[in-house]
């Protein structure tokens, strides 16, 4: 079967950006397919329960199919659904989200309120990680860890793309450069970089690169090494933070802290979370980062605590509370589990959770059900783990009251959503 081309009718798009089909009763996941198409595909992986394939020829095309604007699409692994027009991307993401909640979450009536589209289909990302391999600057292929050399990335902010020729110049003097991470502020026009290298880079050399090779809006570079899957900072030259502005709020964001990637939706995202949360007396913001939600939420309640396991993020969050003149918010360097455990027995009206793609840990779900806050605002970036968590939380006494999809990641399979859960009457 692996050498023989398959003829497949694609039923729908599924999480991961694959077209879903069946052949002789077996599930087939087809890369670069569109819903309702007839395609010819080549098998790339054969498993007992399913097959993975890639489109080689479109026999009957979907009206939603388009020529991908990016010349690297089909090689580069950064985008999965660029061959679909944006309307179809949103429709498919909505279908995947709702189907996940019904099938996995066992939620029969989903109070879905619609999608918030990105204000830009392209050039929306203000954080980018360039991979470097044999003088190629770009991103890994979708099928192997081989870097596709690019002149620009259509998802990256235009300013970030301006850095690519400068990175090529840096490669002439730092031969073992493996990655360059860019963190850019479109509201202040400033950026910090992480250089990930095998060996320690000379500090004077890095200072010279900052002053003479990179554009003046790059305000700092951190030198990092890899230890396992983690990055360890050796030292920095220049500043190690930039500032972002979202409406009236200011945020300091250090090189090791996280900030929302799609700058075109910052204000919308914040507005929706504030709207879902409403007023409260005491709140917790778990996975709080630099206080993106926590600090504005402090205006709507008497007191709120933010927790995050990242020490850099907590330092930024504490600084951000000061520059925004908020004195009813405190931050703690702790995992969500540890922070919740310390709050057992306390009356909590609101908990905001924004977990990684793996969703909430079992221990975190257990503590939420034990503490029973009046409201949980759940920000999800994975509909399958989100549905799993909702199934457990709704069985434990919560009801899903509101749900919206916010498309922070156009051209990719990633699905972000905001949900409100309240204790059942």
Swiss-Prot record:
Pfam families, per the entry? tRNA_U5-meth_tr (PF05958)
Q: Where does [4Fe-4S] cluster bind?
A: 70, 76, 79, 153
| GO biological-process terms attached to the record | rRNA base methylation
UniProt-annotated binding residues for S-adenosyl-L-methionine:
260, 308, 354
EC number(s) reported in the record: 2.1.1.-
The UniProt record lists the TRAM domain at 1-57
Q: Does the keyword Nucleus apply?
A: no
Which residues catalyse the reaction? Answer: 381
Would you say which domain of life the source belongs to?
Bacteria
* CDD domains for the chain: AdoMet_MTases
Q: Which GO terms describe its molecular function?
A: 4 iron, 4 sulfur cluster binding; metal ion binding; rRNA (uridine-C5-)-methyltransferase activity
Output the InterPro entries linked to this UniProt entry: MeTrfase_TrmA_AS, MeTrfase_TrmA_CS, NA-bd_OB-fold, SAM-dependent_MTases_sf, TRAM_dom, U5_MeTrfase_fam
Q: State the UniProt keywords alphabetically.
A: 4Fe-4S, Iron, Iron-sulfur, Metal-binding, Methyltransferase, S-adenosyl-L-methionine, Transferase
Family (UniProt)? Belongs to the class I-like SAM-binding methyltransferase superfamily. RNA M5U methyltransferase family.
Q: What is this protein called?
A: Uncharacterized RNA methyltransferase aq_257
User: Which source organism does the UniProt entry give?
Assistant: Aquifex aeolicus (strain VF5)
């Amino acid at each position: 079967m692996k050498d023989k081309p398959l003829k497949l009718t694609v039923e729908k798009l599924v999480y991961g950006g694959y077209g879903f089909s069946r052949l002789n009763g077996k599930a087939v996941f087809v890369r670069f397919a569109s819903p309702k198409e007839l395609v010819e595909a080549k098998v790339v992986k054969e498993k007992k329960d399913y097959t993975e394939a890639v489109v080689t020829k479109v026999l009957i095309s979907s009206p939603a199919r388009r020529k991908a604007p990016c010349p690297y699409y089909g090689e580069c692994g950064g985008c999965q659904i660029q061959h679909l027009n944006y309307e179809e991307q949103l429709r498919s993401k909505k279908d995947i989200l709702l189907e996940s909640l019904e099938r996995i979450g066992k939620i029969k009536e989903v109070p879905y309120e619609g999608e918030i589209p990105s204000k830009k289909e392209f050039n929306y990302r203000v954080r980018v990680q360039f991979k470097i391999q044999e003088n190629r600057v770009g991103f890994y292929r979708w099928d192997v860890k081989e870097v596709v050399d690019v002149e620009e990335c259509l998802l990256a902010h235009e300013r970030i793309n301006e850095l690519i020729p400068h990175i090529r110049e840096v490669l002439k003097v730092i031969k073992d450069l493996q990655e360059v991470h860019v963190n850019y502020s479109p509201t202040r026009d400033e950026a910090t970089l992480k250089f990930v290298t095998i060996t320690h880079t000379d500090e004077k050399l890095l200072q010279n690169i900052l002053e003479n090779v990179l554009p003046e809006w790059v305000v700092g570079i951190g030198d990092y090494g890899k230890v396992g899957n983690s990055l360890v900072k050796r030292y920095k030259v220049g500043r190690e933070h930039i500032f972002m502005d979202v409406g009236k709020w200011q945020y300091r964001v250090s090189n090791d802290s996280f900030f929302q990637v799609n700058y075109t939706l910052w204000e919308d995202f914040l507005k929706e979370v504030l709207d879902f949360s409403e007023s409260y007396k005491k709140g917790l913001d778990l996975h709080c980062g630099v206080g993106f939600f926590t600090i504005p939420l402090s205006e709507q309640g008497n007191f709120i605590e933010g927790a995050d396991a990242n020490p850099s993020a907590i330092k930024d969050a504490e600084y951000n509370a000061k520059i925004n003149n908020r004195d009813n918010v405190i931050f703690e360097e702790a995992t969500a589990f540890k922070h919740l455990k310390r709050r057992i027995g306390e009356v909590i009206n609101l908990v905001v959770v924004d977990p990684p793609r793996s969703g909430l840990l079992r221990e975190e779900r257990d503590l939420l059900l034990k503490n029973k806050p009046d409201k949980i605002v759940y920000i999800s970036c994975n509909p399958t783990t989100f549905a799993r968590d909702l199934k457990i939380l709704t069985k434990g006494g919560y009801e899903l009251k509101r749900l919206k999809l916010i498309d922070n990641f156009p051209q990719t399979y990633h699905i972000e959503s905001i949900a409100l859960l309240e204790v059942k009457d």
